[in-house]
């Protein structure tokens, strides 16, 4: 019975992705009876729920048996949970119900049609309500004094703008094979702009790959610069993958068979691959979960599970249930919860997630250390990322304790909200004052992003779909090791240089190998990798990602390019046009844009036209702007996104009325260096923490780093 049901789901999923064919208009289907629509909705719910349950049981079984692959680990952290899962489930109900309806109504032998074109407005409302999509658009009164956890009511006119679990913004229309949902590269022989797309693994091999001897360290940026980029990215966006991670047809495990069946979109292996010799093998890949269709628009979009604001949601969460779990509910002091089993030299660590089958346990079975719990599910991805999460939980609790000393009459909720508000402002200041000028170049950011001029309710603050790929530029700055340094900034410990491929999901390294101080010193005193056109991504990420638990390590570059196709993102030239930049058409023009004829020739040998170059690889290949770590295209996209996140935020720290004048003056003195000083055993820090400094040059005593004076919060 289960096999038959899974087979039916597989056939249905394939049907849903059937594309609009080019040519004559479809024949008109019969009117839709309410009973037929209700039947389709009921059947869709059964199919979706069965697929979800089958997938969840399979992953749990592999985790329990210790046979989980890296894709299972990735799946665990990319799975939608709580409210996000309900939103994704609603979208799947609707997509599947529409697919069933099209199957029933389509005249035999006619071309496919769009079911939403023949449904009446009451029928569309019924479908939206029955699926759960309508619940996401409920009106509400906005009278909140503080930011909501979900980001709702930031914009009083449109309360859902920038809120969690909403569709990503589209700055350009999506481009799919079938104009609706099929990614380019799905159908063999299907052309894009007149040419076949190269395999993403082939692009990774020929453009991104480089010998380790060519690695160049960045003399101007520290590894902390790279790490803050990932931290802030996890504040802004997260597009979860489909909860159904096995091919439905006949219960096939597409990680074992490389079957291309929804939602599996495996990365194929080219001939003469330098590492994977079996061309019939693949790198598993699963599509991002869809968003609920908007109005009659059935073009696939993806959701952002996080708030779109720079609001420290990676510390506090983007869902109310998670935010409550993260708080210390044993007292009324406004504190965040911390670990009850372990400490870091007397200082707090993140609490454990307390899961029964924990993927972090697989990285060291004898250590028995589970994953940590934080505002973002990816906090245990690497110890470096965990270190920043830990740092800001400690800072919140430090602020809450100090605010209570100043205001003993404040309630626990007020202490929590005021400390959260300050931490949010800190993240905004560090990002816009210290980080972005080093990304974009100080001269350019003054000219393009400009000073803050106030809140504008007409600005759409939502994270753009393209930004979720473009901001992965930070992958090019990762060194192949995690560096840990002692109190004298020496690499004296036995595990001071750990290969990057050995630290993924290794929460045990925080507990049993010295805590976060050595990691933070390593981030401050080690230069980032410099992104160069002949050395883009280290092999620890390109060939060995999660290799410790799988026969084939994943390829992060290939995953990024496959994801851009999955999301229906337009190609390189479309984004150049969006930014008002030239659109190269031939070798000579692309050579001028890249200032590199050999690289341009490689691109055209693979893609045939610059129009088809995948946005991530095309953007990171551009020459860096003066004083920046990105080229013109990424600079344009980042400026656009970060301007929207600032000007469309009703709770921006500089907005009149959010903080008092005295409080704003006090906040201007904060720094990431000071946060390190206040919450660790480190006594000597980098003054300019994102710039490359080789100890002791550029390092000062914590006594010389300005402190935040909280007296402006007394009696507020």
Swiss-Prot record:
Its main location: cytoplasm. The active site is at 234 (proton acceptor). GO terms for biological process: defense response to nematode; eosinophil migration; hydrogen peroxide catabolic process; negative regulation of interleukin-10 production; negative regulation of interleukin-5 production; negative regulation of macrophage cytokine production; positive regulation of interleukin-4 production; response to oxidative stress. The modification 3'-nitrotyrosine is found at residue 489. Belongs to the peroxidase family. XPO subfamily. PANTHER family: EOSINOPHIL PEROXIDASE (PTHR11475:SF63), OXIDASE/PEROXIDASE (PTHR11475). Tetramer of two light chains and two heavy chains. PROSITE patterns: PEROXIDASE_1, PEROXIDASE_3. Its EC number is 1.11.1.7. Heme b binds at residues 233, 381, 475. Binds 1 Ca(2+) ion per heterodimer. Binds 1 heme b (iron(II)-protoporphyrin IX) group covalently per heterodimer. The record marks 378 as: Transition state stabilizer. GO terms for molecular function: heme binding; lactoperoxidase activity; metal ion binding; peroxidase activity. Glycans are attached at residues 53, 114, 328, 364, 709. It catalyses: 2 a phenolic donor + H2O2 = 2 a phenolic radical donor + 2 H2O. It is found in: Cytoplasmic granule. This is Eosinophil peroxidase. Disulfide bonds join 142-153, 254-264, 258-282, 360-371, 579-636, 677-702. Residues 1-18 form the signal peptide. Keywords: Calcium, Disulfide bond, Glycoprotein, Heme, Hydrogen peroxide, Iron, Metal-binding, Nitration, Oxidoreductase, Peroxidase, Signal. Residues 19-140 form a propeptide. Mediates tyrosine nitration of secondary granule proteins in mature resting eosinophils. Ca(2+) binds at residues 235, 307, 309, 311, 313. InterPro entries: Haem_peroxidase_animal, Haem_peroxidase_sf, Haem_peroxidase_sf_animal. Its cofactor is Ca(2+); heme b.
């Amino acid at each position: 019975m289960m096999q038959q049901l899974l087979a039916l789901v597989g056939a249905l999923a394939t049907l849903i992705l059937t594309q609009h064919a080019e040519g004559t208009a479809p024949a008109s289907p019969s009117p839709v009876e309410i009973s037929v629509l209700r039947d389709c909705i009921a059947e869709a719910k059964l199919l979706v729920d069965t697929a979800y349950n089958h997938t969840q049981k399979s992953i749990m079984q592999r985790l329990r048996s210790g046979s989980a692959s890296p894709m299972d680990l990735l799946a665990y952290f990319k799975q939608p949970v709580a409210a996000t899962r309900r939103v994704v489930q609603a979208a799947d109900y609707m997509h599947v119900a529409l697919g069933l309806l099209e199957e029933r109504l389509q005249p035999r032998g006619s071309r496919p049609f769009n079911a939403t074109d023949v449904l009446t407005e009451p029928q569309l409302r019924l479908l939206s309500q029955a699926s759960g999509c309508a619940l996401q658009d409920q009106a509400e009164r906005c009278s909140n004094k503080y930011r909501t956890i979900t980001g709702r009511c930031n914009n009083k006119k449109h309360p859902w703008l920038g809120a969690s679990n909403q569709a990503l913004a589209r700055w350009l229309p999506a481009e799919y094979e079938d104009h609706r949902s099929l990614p380019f590269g799905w159908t063999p022989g299907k052309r894009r702009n007149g040419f076949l797309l190269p395999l993403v693994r082939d692009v990774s091999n020929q453009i991104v790959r480089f010998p380790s001897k060519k690695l160049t360290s960045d003399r101007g940026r520290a590894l902390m610069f790279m790490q803050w980029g990932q931290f802030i990215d996890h504040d802004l966006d997260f597009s979860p993958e489909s909860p159904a991670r096995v091919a439905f047809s006949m219960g096939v495990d597409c990680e074992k068979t490389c079957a291309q069946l929804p939602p599996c979109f495996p990365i194929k292996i080219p001939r003469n691959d330098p590492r994977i010799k079996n061309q019939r093998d693949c790198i598993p890949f699963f599509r991002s979960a869809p968003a609920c269709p908007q109005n009659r628009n059935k073009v696939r979009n993806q959701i952002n599970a996080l708030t779109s604001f720079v609001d420290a949601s990676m510390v506090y969460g983007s869902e109310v249930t998670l935010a409550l779990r993260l708080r210390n509910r044993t007292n009324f002091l406004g504190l965040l919860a911390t670990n009850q089993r372990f400490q870091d030299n007397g200082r707090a660590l993140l609490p454990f997630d307390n899961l029964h089958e924990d993927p972090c346990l697989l990285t060291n079975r004898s250590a028995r250390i589970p994953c940590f719990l934080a505002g973002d599910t990816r906090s245990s991805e690497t110890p470096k990322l965990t270190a920043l999460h830990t740092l800001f939980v400690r800072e919140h609790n430090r602020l809450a304790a100090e605010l209570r000393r100043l205001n003993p009459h404040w309630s626990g909720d007020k202490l929590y909200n005021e400390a959260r508000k300050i931490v949010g402002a800190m993240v905004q200041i560090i990002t816009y004052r210290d980080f972005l000028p080093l990304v974009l170049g100080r001269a350019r950011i003054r000219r393009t992003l400009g000073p803050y001029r106030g809140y504008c309710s007409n600005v759409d603050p939502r994270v753009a779909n393209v930004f979720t790929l473009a901001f992965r530029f930070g992958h090019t700055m990762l060194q192949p090791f995690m560096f840990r340094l002692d109190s004298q900034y020496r690499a004296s410990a036995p595990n001071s240089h750990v290969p990057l491929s050995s630290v993924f999901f290794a929460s045990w390294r925080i507990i049993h190998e010295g805590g976060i101080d050595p990691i933070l010193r390593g981030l401050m005193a080690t230069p980032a990798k410099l992104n160069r056109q002949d050395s883009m991504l280290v092999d620890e990420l390109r060939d060995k990602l999660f290799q410790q638990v799988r026969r084939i390590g994943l390829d992060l570059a290939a995953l990024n390019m496959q994801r851009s196709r999955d999301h229906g993102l337009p190609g390189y030239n479309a984004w150049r046009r969006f930014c008002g930049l030239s659109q190269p058409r031939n070798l000579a023009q692309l050579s001028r844009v890249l200032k590199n004829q050999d690289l341009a020739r490689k691109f055209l040998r693979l893609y045939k036209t610059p129009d088809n170059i995948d946005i991530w690889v095309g953007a990171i290949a551009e020459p860096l702007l003066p004083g920046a770590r990105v080229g013109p295209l990424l600079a344009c996209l980042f400026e656009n996104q970060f301007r929207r996140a600032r000007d469309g935020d009703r709770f921006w720290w500089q907005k009149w009325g959010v903080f008092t004048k005295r409080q704003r003056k006090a906040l201007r003195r904060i720094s990431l260096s000071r946060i390190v000083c206040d919450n660790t055993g480190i006594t000597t820090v980098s003054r300019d923490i994102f710039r490359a400094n080789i100890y002791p040059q550029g390092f000062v005593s914590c006594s010389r780093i300005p402190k935040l004076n909280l007296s402006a919060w007394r009696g507020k």
